[in-house]
Amino acid sequence: MTRYKATIAYDGTDFAGFQSQTNQRTVQEEIEKVLSKLNSFEPVILQGSGRTDSGVHAFGQVIHFDLNGKARDLERLRFGLDTQTPADIAVKKVELVPDDWHARYQKHEKTYEYYLENSVTRSPFHRHSKAYFRYPLNFERMQGAMVKLVGQHDFTGFTASGSSVDDKVRTIYQAEIIQLDKENFKFIFRGNGFLYKQVRNMVGTVIKIGNDRMPVSQIDKILTSKNRNFAGPTAAPEGLYLKEVKYEPINEI
């Protein structure tokens, strides 16, 4: 058996998320179908760096999987995966990794981007690739809120109730908002890990602050109280992208 690491991109619009689910179309299931063909039709179970929810996209999700036999030509393997998976999945890179390398448990940091259209009418061309908010937003207020998210915090107040993780302390290295033009914003979050729906809950809160329906100091209150009820709504999934998963260098195999 040989272990491979792959970097993939996908349009999450027509998926019920990344992780396999019964009677649902998922990214994991579609890739595993192709991997099985390339593995003499023996089942292959892949592991991802983490899951993304229904409607969430990825520029740089990372997976690993094992295939029978010796190491294969990496470009041929990448090409085979890329051309046989559906059009809403792209396989960007395939690498060899040690047998004990794990996409989820290897030390890494993740970067998410969130795209928001802020206009009177929503563009029909971006309805699956950007979130939408029609009411006025104050850029300076949102900037002030984002700064407060940087650092090591207990993010319980920004976690969905379905989270089963006990330790909710995470470190955010970068929390930035960029005004791309008068109608479009990009949020950037880079950290050592994120809880279930944490990014979308943070974005929903910052939007509410930008719309002057919460004070900038609300961020402090949420972090201190660890109370989800003090945070804003969960932002829509279509604006969220897993941009990059960055690992420590792999030793030569």
From Swiss-Prot:
Keywords, comma-separated and alphabetical: Isomerase, tRNA processing
Residue sites binding substrate per the record: Y112
Any one GO BP annotation for this protein: tRNA pseudouridine synthesis
Enzyme Commission numbers on file: 5.4.99.12
InterPro entries per UniProt: PsdUridine_synth_cat_dom_sf, PsdUridine_synth_TruA, PsdUridine_synth_TruA_a/b_dom, PsdUridine_synth_TruA_C, TruA/RsuA/RluB/E/F_N
Stored SUPFAM superfamilies: Pseudouridine synthase
Gene Ontology MF terms: RNA binding; tRNA pseudouridine(38-40) synthase activity
EC top class, as a word: isomerase
Subunit (UniProt): Homodimer.
Task of the protein: Formation of pseudouridine at positions 38, 39 and 40 in the anticodon stem and loop of transfer RNAs.
Name the UniProt record assigns to this protein: tRNA pseudouridine synthase A
Organism of derivation: Lactococcus lactis subsp. cremoris (strain MG1363)
